[in-house]
C-alpha cells in the first residue's frame, strides 16, 4: 500500500512514521503533489500554528492537491484543525475549508489550564469502522489549545471544560484532535482501522 505522510514542516513526522511501521506498513514522507495524488492513504500531521501550516502548504502547492483527493486522508491535531474553514489563531487564518461552516476557536474554560495536555476520553459510536475494536473506556493523548466545536461532521467528542470535536469525518477526509501515534494500543488500533478503511 502506498502511504504518504505530508511534510508541512510543522510536525514531528518520525513518531507517526514509526507508529505506521509498527503496524507493518511502509510510508513515505513527502511534499510532492504527484506522490500525494497517487498514494492510497495520506496522513496530515500538524504541530504549531495554523498560519505556519497554511504558509507551508501554500509554498509547496499542496492546498489544491488536498482539495482534489478522493482517497482517505487523516488530519492529526493541527492537521484536523486546518480542514476547517477558518481559524481564530494568529489573528485569523483562512484554512483549507473541507469541513464547511466549521471554525477553529480557542478552547475557553475558565478554571482549566491551557494547553489541554494529557489523557482524555472520547465519546463515540462504535459502529463506525474507525472505532473498530476500541473500548469506550480507552483514553487518548491530547496537546492543544484550539478546538473545532461540535458540528454535523463530528464522529466523537471530548470534554475539557466544554465539549469539542475530537474525531471528524466528511467523505474521505478524517480528522483527530488527539495524537493516535502517542496514544498507546488504542491509538495504534485507530491508525490500523484508518489504514484498513
From Swiss-Prot:
Active-site residues per Swiss-Prot or TrEMBL entry: 77 (nucleophile), 179, 181
Keywords per UniProt: Amino-acid biosynthesis, Cytoplasm, Glutamine amidotransferase, Histidine biosynthesis, Hydrolase, Lyase
GO CC annotation, single: cytoplasm
Keyword presence, RNA-binding: no
Pathway(s) the chain acts in: Amino-acid biosynthesis; L-histidine biosynthesis; L-histidine from 5-phospho-alpha-D-ribose 1-diphosphate: step 5/9
Protein location: Cytoplasm
HAMAP family cross-referenced by the UniProt entry: HisH
NCBIfam families, sorted: IMP_synth_hisH
Name of this protein: Imidazole glycerol phosphate synthase subunit HisH
